[in-house]
């Protein structure tokens, strides 16, 4: 028998509504909303991250930028902070070694050939 208080605190992994394997293909331009989507998709069982390391973001949102009077610098600050986000600030996603692409990310044919070789 479980303790109701402890059972309630344990996160339950969502079921994967997809019958097929989900492969998230990223490069270094995946940031902000892309990382938020990664947070959600990677929580599904059987999801694989492939490609290259993503960018990173912070917990701060709604960023304002103010040029300083000298014109030499600008100050950026967030109005909101996502304090309970599981992924910390400046934490990118890195694919496992066997799913890390080392080729030219601008070469679509090479990406496809590489990914096809992983799926065989």
What are these regions (language model features)?
Residues 1-120:
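C-terminal "post-core" interaction segments
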